[in-house]
């Protein structure tokens, strides 16, 4: 029987509708909350979920799958868990946790998920990057050879840092660890102003973990006043944020820094501080019923920090020659650097800057213990001129500390010992520096050169800072520029007479 045109039209319409019926359907795997509390949700029914996958709760809060068990999945909640109830639906997103990255992030303050919290609207053009990626392999790397200047005389001369290095800042609370980190960010301002290309610019990422909101607010204000926020990104997971966000923040900040590293640029990332991240991870692990180990930390707490810090690297020329330099911060208790987390991070990093409360209260600020501080790879990146002028200073300081202990007994000292004590006292005074006042490298070289060559030996200690200010302002700009290339016999002639003359005027 032949269909009428109208019936044929209807048949075709039905066929196309049936064929396309399932085209717009999206099949989601969903589970149900079995129990929830303390930022951890146990969910039943997500059988195909991946480790580290993002999930979405019914109230819009996000979470991440950490424990994959036979029956349930242990999910950490990125936000408040008070609105999540037993029996609520949980949906898989199919994607691993990622955050925004790119130049649009510069000047912004974001949370651990990359959501802006500075009240300046949504982010403009950016890309999404996974928070957990593998560190660059051996062939993709190059040895550290470019200096990363902090603007601090004590650091740039005695424990130099190179681009792509990991240098630990370790010390008790209130010893100036954050101040060194902030000074380093501020010092990049004058380095970036001289940069002739994008590949010379240093971008900064500061990750605040478990700090007070007021402290983070002061920090933002300091960076804004110095116009340093324009080349910086701030990632804040404050003390009032849930433990999962404090755990995630360093990885999010690292992903943002890797954008610059992988695109042939240079970035500096500061984790302030990783002790609080370890405590947050311990809290999550214990709530997920993972077996505790030393100091109740889980067995993989070393891997927590090693996989993060290994992502800081200097890339080879074939892979863009970018770099990511890391300055992790660790807080010790009563100067105990042999505790679990401090020893872990010391063994992962390429050196450490040790700060001490006693030195801080004696007025030696930055309170760096030169004897315990070391930079394992930084000397290869140190400026030639700086290496030449401060070569003997570390040895002289060590001899001074040894002799100073005996000198306290007040016995008669010979002329050589007296000269050593004089020189050591001046070499201890020269590295002192006020906070948020980084010094350009060429001015540091002049000041240290004067101290090492004995021009300050007869000068009263309280006049050294005055001498320091007088030197660079009177030296010819050409000499300051030339100092960056290293000292030669010809270059030494000019500053010698001038520095001695200045010193005599202040004796």
From Swiss-Prot:
HAMAP family (UniProt xref): ATP_synth_alpha_bact
Disulfide bonds: none
Subcellular location: Mitochondrion; Mitochondrion inner membrane
Binding site for ATP: 171-178
Keywords: ATP synthesis, ATP-binding, CF(1), Hydrogen ion transport, Ion transport, Membrane, Mitochondrion, Mitochondrion inner membrane, Nucleotide-binding, Transport
Keyword field contains DNA-binding: no
Assembly, per entry: F-type ATPases have 2 components, CF(1) - the catalytic core - and CF(0) - the membrane proton channel. CF(1) has five subunits: alpha(3), beta(3), gamma(1), delta(1), epsilon(1). CF(0) has three main subunits: a, b and c.
GO process annotations (BP): proton motive force-driven ATP synthesis
Entry similarity comment: Belongs to the ATPase alpha/beta chains family.
Organism: Brassica campestris
Database matches in SUPFAM superfamilies: C-terminal domain of alpha and beta subunits of F1 ATP synthase (SSF47917), N-terminal domain of alpha and beta subunits of F1 ATP synthase (SSF50615), P-loop containing nucleoside triphosphate hydrolases (SSF52540)
Site feature Required for activity, where: 373
GO cellular component assignments: mitochondrial inner membrane; proton-transporting ATP synthase complex
Annotated function: Mitochondrial membrane ATP synthase (F(1)F(0) ATP synthase or Complex V) produces ATP from ADP in the presence of a proton gradient across the membrane which is generated by electron transport complexes of the respiratory chain. F-type ATPases consist of two structural domains, F(1) - containing the extramembraneous catalytic core, and F(0) - containing the membrane proton channel, linked together by a central stalk and a peripheral stalk. During catalysis, ATP synthesis in the catalytic domain of F(1) is coupled via a rotary mechanism of the central stalk subunits to proton translocation.
A GO MF term: proton-transporting ATP synthase activity, rotational mechanism
CDD domains linked: ATP-synt_F1_alpha_C, ATP-synt_F1_alpha_N, F1-ATPase_alpha_CD
InterPro entries for the chain: ATP_synth_asu-like_sf, ATP_synth_asu_C, ATP_synth_asu_C_sf, ATP_synth_F1_a_nt-bd_dom, ATP_synth_F1_asu, ATPase_a/bsu_AS, ATPase_F1/V1/A1_a/bsu_N, ATPase_F1/V1/A1_a/bsu_N_sf
Stated name of the protein: ATP synthase subunit alpha, mitochondrial
């Amino acid at each position: 029987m032949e269909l009428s045109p109208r019936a044929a039209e209807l048949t075709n319409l039905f066929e196309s509708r049936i064929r396309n019926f399932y085209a717009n359907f999206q099949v989601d795997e969903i589970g149900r909350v079995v129990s929830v509390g303390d930022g951890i949700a146990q969910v039943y029914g997500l059988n195909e979920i991946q480790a580290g996958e993002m999930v979405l709760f019914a109230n819009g809060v996000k979470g991440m799958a950490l424990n994959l068990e036979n029956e349930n999945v242990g999910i950490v909640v990125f936000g408040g868990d008070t609105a999540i109830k037993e029996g609520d639906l949980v949906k898989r997103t199919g994607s691993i946790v990622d955050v925004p990255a790119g130049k649009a992030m510069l000047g912004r303050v974001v949370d651990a998920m990359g959501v802006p919290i500075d009240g300046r609207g949504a982010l403009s053009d950016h890309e999404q990057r996974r928070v957990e990626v593998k560190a660059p392999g051996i062939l993709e790397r190059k040895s550290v050879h470019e200096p990363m200047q902090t603007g601090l005389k004590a650091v740039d001369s005695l424990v130099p840092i190179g681009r792509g290095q990991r240098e630990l800042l370790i010390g008790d609370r209130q010893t100036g660890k954050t101040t060194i980190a902030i000074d380093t960010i501020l010092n990049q301002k004058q380095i970036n102003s001289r940069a002739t290309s994008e590949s010379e610019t240093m971008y900064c990422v500061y990750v605040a973990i478990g700090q007070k909101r007021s402290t983070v607010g002061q920090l933002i204000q300091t960076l804004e006043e110095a116009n340093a926020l324009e080349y910086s990104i701030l990632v804040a997971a404050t003390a009032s944020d849930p433990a999962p966000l404090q755990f995630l923040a360093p990885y999010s900040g690292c992903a943002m820094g890797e954008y610059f590293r992988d695109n042939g640029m240079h970035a500096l990332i500061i984790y302030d501080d990783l002790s609080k991240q370890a405590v947050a991870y311990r809290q999550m692990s214990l709530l997920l019923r993972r077996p505790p180990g030393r100091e109740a930390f889980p067995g993989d707490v070393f891997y927590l920090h090693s996989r993060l810090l290994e992502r800081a690297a200097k890339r080879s020329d074939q892979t863009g020659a970018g770099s990511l330099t890391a300055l992790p911060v660790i807080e010790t208790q009563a100067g105990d650097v042999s505790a679990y987390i401090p020893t872990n991070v010391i063994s992962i990093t390429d050196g450490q800057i040790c700060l001490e409360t006693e030195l801080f209260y004696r007025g030696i600020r930055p309170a760096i213990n030169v004897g315990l501080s070391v930079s394992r790879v930084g000397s290869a990146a140190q400026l030639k001129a700086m290496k030449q002028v401060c070569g003997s200073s570390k040895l002289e300081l060590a001899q001074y500390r040894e002799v100073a202990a005996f000198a306290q007994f007040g016995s008669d000292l010979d002329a050589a010992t007296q000269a050593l004590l004089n020189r050591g006292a001046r070499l201890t005074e020269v590295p002192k520096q006020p906070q948020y006042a980084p010094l350009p490298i060429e001015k540091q070289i002049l000041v240290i050169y004067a101290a090492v060559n004995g021009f300050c030996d007869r000068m009263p200690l309280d006049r050294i800072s005055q001498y320091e200010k007088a030197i660079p302002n009177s030296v010819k700009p050409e000499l300051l520029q030339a100092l960056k290339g290293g000292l030669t016999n010809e270059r030494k002639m000019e500053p010698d007479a001038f520095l001695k003359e200045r010193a005599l005027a202040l004796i």
